[in-house]
């Protein structure tokens, strides 16, 4: 399989800089505006209300789940509902104890600290975070060698909200210090339809119901993908100048242009399935081997591609590696000839 299929790709879960402003405008600001994840919303509402009644900061919270389900949005909502400001950072940006110390010492009383990809923090920073979360203080080492001393630094009370796509990589002592942990689930087509209806209203798009329904079923169970496909469909509607109202026919034409198929697979999804079939005879194949062949990070494949393919029944994980299913062969039109060479239509 030619690898140039991955060049200049547009992964539906990636957020480009020119889309951040639009995405921010579509973000719900309060729990009442947030569609889906009802159990998590109710639990967060209780957490926030209890903290207000007791006059303390909200408990630390860990939000886990695949990309694009609303972890960052929920963190911003928690800050808004608590009436406090939010400071945003990420695990890869906190690699030294000094990085974390500077961040924590600058927090205002009651402020919410959001750390995305918290599982990617360095171990030394994680260990400093234990004491900060539990006692609102950190120990600063002064001096070097045998004469070095530890000086305690008191911190303003704060709330930490961590987000992760790989909760299993967090050490137990860190997970245990979160007072609340939630896993966000993929959305149903019906929930995604509600997301699209709200976004279409904010974007002032006129539509027929079946147009949004056709986008919802192709949105991979992910609101970020749903909103991205809606923006791309709106672009197609404006450029084609064929109608002022978004119809199902126009939506499907836009999906064809952006290479999103009936199950919501994009180019990279199909490239993974093609690679396993063409190069590795349908599998099983190890993630490192697959990553090297595709020229794509293993973490991207594991976090952004595999969950949806597994959920759709197109891919299975076995002790020996990844393997495509009969459903994937049927959907992709893969064929095996009698000579043992595998072909696809």
UniProtKB/Swiss-Prot annotation:
ATP binds at residues 26-27, 68, 71-73, 134-136, 177, 187, 224. It is found in: Cytoplasm. The keyword Hydrolase applies. Residues 188-259 are annotated as: Small ATPAse domain (RuvB-S). The keyword Hydrolase applies. One of its GO terms (biological process) is DNA repair. Residues 262-345 are annotated as: Head domain (RuvB-H). Residues 3-187 are annotated as: Large ATPase domain (RuvB-L). Has 3 domains, the large (RuvB-L) and small ATPase (RuvB-S) domains and the C-terminal head (RuvB-H) domain. The head domain binds DNA, while the ATPase domains jointly bind ATP, ADP or are empty depending on the state of the subunit in the translocation cycle. During a single DNA translocation step the structure of each domain remains the same, but their relative positions change. HAMAP family: DNA_HJ_migration_RuvB. The RuvA-RuvB-RuvC complex processes Holliday junction (HJ) DNA during genetic recombination and DNA repair, while the RuvA-RuvB complex plays an important role in the rescue of blocked DNA replication forks via replication fork reversal (RFR). RuvA specifically binds to HJ cruciform DNA, conferring on it an open structure. The RuvB hexamer acts as an ATP-dependent pump, pulling dsDNA into and through the RuvAB complex. RuvB forms 2 homohexamers on either side of HJ DNA bound by 1 or 2 RuvA tetramers; 4 subunits per hexamer contact DNA at a time. This is Holliday junction branch migration complex subunit RuvB. It comes from Tropheryma whipplei (strain Twist) (Whipple's bacillus). The lineage of its organism: Bacteria, Bacillati, Actinomycetota, Actinomycetes, Micrococcales.
């Amino acid at each position: 399989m030619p690898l140039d299929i991955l060049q200049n790709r547009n992964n539906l879960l990636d957020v480009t800089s020119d889309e951040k402003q639009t995405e921010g405008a579509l973000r719900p600001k309060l729990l009442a505006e947030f569609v889906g994840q009802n159990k998590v919303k109710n639990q967060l509402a209780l957490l926030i209300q209890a903290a207000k009644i007791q006059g303390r900061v909200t408990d630390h919270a860990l939000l886990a789940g695949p990309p694009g389900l609303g972890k960052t949005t929920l963190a911003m909502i928690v800050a808004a509902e608590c009436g406090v400001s939010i400071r945003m950072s990420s695990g890869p940006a906190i690699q030294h104890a000094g990085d974390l110390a500077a961040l924590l010492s600058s927090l205002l009383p009651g402020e919410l600290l959001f750390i995305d990809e918290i599982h990617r923090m360095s171990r030394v920073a994680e260990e400093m975070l234990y004491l900060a979360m539990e006692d609102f203080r950190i120990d600063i080492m002064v001096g070097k060698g045998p004469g070095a001393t530890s000086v305690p630094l008191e911190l303003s009370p704060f709330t930490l909200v961590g987000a992760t796509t790989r909760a299993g990589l967090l050490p137990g002592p860190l997970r245990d210090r979160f007072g609340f942990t939630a896993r966000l689930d993929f959305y149903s087509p019906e929930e995604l339809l509600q997301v699209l209806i709200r976004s279409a209203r904010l974007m002032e798009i006129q539509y027929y119901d079946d147009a949004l329904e056709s986008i919802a079923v192709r949105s991979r169970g992910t609101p970020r993908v749903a909103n991205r496909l809606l923006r791309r469909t709106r672009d197609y509607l404006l450029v084609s100048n064929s109608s002022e109202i978004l119809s199902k026919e126009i939506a499907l034409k836009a999906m064809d242009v952006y290479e999103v198929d009936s199950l919501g697979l994009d180019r990279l999804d199909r490239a993974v399935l093609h690679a396993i079939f063409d190069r590795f005879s349908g599998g099983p194949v190890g993630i490192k081997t697959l990553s090297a062949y595709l020229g794509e990070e293993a973490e991207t494949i594991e976090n952004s591609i595999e969950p949806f393919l597994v959920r759709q029944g197109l891919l299975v994980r076995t002790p020996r590696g990844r393997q495509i299913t009969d459903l994937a062969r049927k959907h992709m039109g893969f064929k095996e000839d009698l000579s043992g060479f595998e072909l696809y239509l």
